[in-house]
Amino acid sequence: MDVAIIGIGLHRFGRSPELSGMQQGASAVRAALADAGMAWKDMQFAYGGSQDGGNADALVNELGLTGLQFTNIWNGCATGGSSLHAAYTAIKSGEYDMGVVVGFDKHPRGAFNP
């Protein structure tokens, strides 16, 4: 089975005090789904992670309770790559046909200063 990324979505990078990290993640997922011409209800699984923005699986509260399997991945700075690899493996194995990968965070000013 071939595996491809068919949609991408990003929330604007920068300060967004009016939005939580979770809301920014949901915005990115909606943009990716629109880019792919798909709907959240069509997704069979999701993998995602966040260090400080909340549990990624809680995005279902923003996107809709469809019953899909949402697995939290946490692997520090490699969370995005690990989530993509997990999704690739799930589709390549034939277990699923369509899914979402998302990563998001929101840090206070100066969070990366030593």
List the predicted regions and their residue ranges.
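Conserved "HGTGT" condensation-loop signature of ketosynthase/thiolase-family condensing enzymes
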Residues: 1-74, 89-93, 104-114
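Functionally engaged cysteine thiol sites
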Residues: 77
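Short conserved active-site loop signatures built around small residues
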Residues: 80
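A short, small-residue-rich loop immediately preceding and capping a beta-strand
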Residues: 97-103
